[in-house]
Amino acid sequence: MRKVTLMDVFTHPIAQKYLQRSGVAHAIACAYHAYRLSVKADINPDLAAKAALLHDIGHYEWYTDGKWDYEKYKRNDIHAIKGAERAHKLLIRLGEEPKAAKEIALAILLHTDSYLPEGELDKNTLQQIVKKADELDEEPGGHHHYRQIDPSTARKKIEKLDQLIDQAQASVIKPV
């Protein structure tokens, strides 16, 4: 039995504040992609879904003359760093196991290479899943962050994903 559910994370005021900024519809879509990918890879779907749900909570909106400046964002982006820290703090506050909170935070930290110097990192499977889940929902110019979802629909999707994770966790899951 999980101590902290996706619904616990999703409904927390801190998560809501940052999910609203980065895009609730995108976060939920990524959580579903991560769930599916993690089940196929025999990786803990709870960790994958939580990391994907929270992967963009470090976003800061870059504007020039009142308009979203995607190029400025790409040049100055550190959202994965801020998001990893925010997610870790939130998960610990909610009672997540420290090791799980760290794994989730690291997956968030490494879901993008926009702030990293050139080169390749050796990412574990969970980290690769969160990156892929984000890529699967991406739209040109960052428009995926602006898709809308009704709050009631969002909650229903999170409830359903929690149920799917509980069912999947009934089987043996290898550690990350």
UniProtKB/Swiss-Prot annotation:
SMART domains cross-referenced by the UniProt entry: HDc
Name of the top EC class for this enzyme: hydrolase
Enzyme Commission number(s): 3.-.-.-
Keywords linked to the UniProt accession: Hydrolase
Domain of life: Bacteria
UniProt xrefs under Pfam families: HD (PF01966)
Domain HD: 23-139
A molecular function GO annotation: hydrolase activity
Protein name: Putative phosphohydrolase YueE
Species name: Bacillus subtilis (strain 168)
